[in-house]
From Swiss-Prot:
Its cofactor is Mg(2+). This is 3-methyl-2-oxobutanoate hydroxymethyltransferase. The active site is at E182 (proton acceptor). Mg(2+) binds at D44, D83, E115. The gene is panB. Pfam families: Pantoate_transf. Its EC number is 2.1.2.11. InterPro entries: Pantoate_hydroxy_MeTrfase, Pyrv/PenolPyrv_kinase-like_dom, Pyrv_kinase-like_dom_sf. Homodecamer; pentamer of dimers. It is found in: Cytoplasm. Its main location: cytoplasm.
Length: 257
C-alpha cells in the first residue's frame, strides 16, 4: 500500500516510529522503497553528496526537479518529499507557489519541505497548504542558513529553545504535515514532540521524536565527512574502492575478461 499523509498521523498516534532517508537518483530510491522506508526525502543535501558543493546553497530548483523526477520513477510505496532549495521560495509567496507547484506537477512528489519557522516561513506554509500543496517543516539547525547560524547545535539557551518551540507550534497551526527537528537538544525535541499532533522527524535530535531521518550517503559510509550525530551502517566507500582496485588489477594483469 502506498504511503499517505493520514498514515503518518496515525503512526504518531499509535507510537509507530517513522523511517525517513534521502535519495538523489533512481537506483537509491528503488532500494529504499523496496526496503519499506516510509518517507524518501529528495534533500538539498544532494548538492553536497551528489554534486560536490560545499554547502546546500548553490543547488537550483531545476536541479532539484531533475533529481526528484529520477527518484519518483524508482518509488512505488514510499512518500516522496522534495526540498525547496535556497531562494526558490523566500522572495515572495507567489514565487513559493510557483516553485512548489512545479515540484509537484513535474516530479510526482507528494510534498515539499521548506526550512525555518519565522513569520515569513509560516505565512508561506499557510498559503501553500491553503491551495492543497502538502508541506513538511524544518526547524533547529537549518542548513540554508549556514552562513548566519553555522552547523552548531541550536536551541541550547532557554531563549533559543522557546523560539524553536514557538516556531514548531506556529508551523503546525499553519498546516505542515510533519516537522523535521535537526540538531537540537534531546529534551527540547521531546518537548516539541509532546506538544504537536503532527509527527516530528529527528536528525541529531535524540530518540524521542516520532521518526528518524539520515542522509543516505552517511548511512552507507559514502561521505568523506559526516555530522557527529550521523551513523554509518556500512563502509560503502571502502567497498567501492576495493572493488575498483580489484577490477583494475585484473584488467592490467590480463585476468579479466
Amino acid at each position: 500500500m502506498a504511503m499517505t499523509l493520514p498514515y503518518l498521523i496515525q503512526a504518531k498516534q499509535q507510537g509507530r516510529p517513522l523511517v525517513a532517508l534521502t535519495a538523489w537518483d533512481y537506483a537509491i530510491a528503488q532500494l529504499l522503497d523496496g526496503a519499506g522506508v516510509d518517507i524518501i526525502l529528495v534533500g538539498d543535501s544532494l548538492a553536497m553528496v551528489a554534486l560536490g558543493h560545499r554547502t546546500t546553497l548553490p543547488i537550483t530548483l531545476d536541479e532539484m526537479i531533475h533529481h526528484a523526477k529520477a527518484v519518483c520513477r524508482g518509488v512505488k510505496q514510499s512518500l516522496v518529499v522534495c526540498d525547496l532549495p535556497f531562494l526558490s521560495y523566500q522572495e515572495s509567496i507567489s514565487q513559493a507557489i510557483r516553485s512548489a507547484g512545479r515540484v509537484l506537477k513535474e516530479t510526482g512528489a507528494q510534498g515539499v519541505k521548506l526550512e525555518g519557522g519565522h513569520a515569513v516561513a509560516v505565512e508561506t506554509v499557510q498559503q501553500l497548504t491553503s491551495i492543497g500543496i502538502p508541506v513538511m517543516g524544518h526547524v533547529g539547525l537549518t542548513p540554508q542558513s549556514v552562513h548566519r547560524l553555522g552547523y552548531r547545535q541550536q536551541g541550547q539557551t532557554e531563549i533559543d529553545a522557546e523560539r524553536i518551540i514557538s516556531e514548531a507550534i506556529a508551523l503546525e497551526n499553519a498546516g505542515v504535515f510533519a516537522l523535521v527537528l535537526e540538531h537540537i537538544p534531546i529534551n527540547l525535541a521531546a518537548t516539541i514532540t509532546s506538544k504537536l499532533s503532527i509527527p516530528t522527524i529527528g536528525i541529531g535530535a535524540g530518540p524521542h521524536c516520532d521518526g528518524q531521518v539520515l542522509v543516505t550517503a552517511d548511512l552507507l559510509g559514502l561521505s568523506k565527512k559526516q555530522p557527529p550525530f550521523a551513523k554509518s551502517y556500512l563502509n560503502l566507500r571502502g567497498l567501492i574502492t576495493e572493488a575498483v582496485n580489484e577490477f583494475s588489477r585484473e584488467v592490467r594483469e590480463g585476468e579479466f575478461p
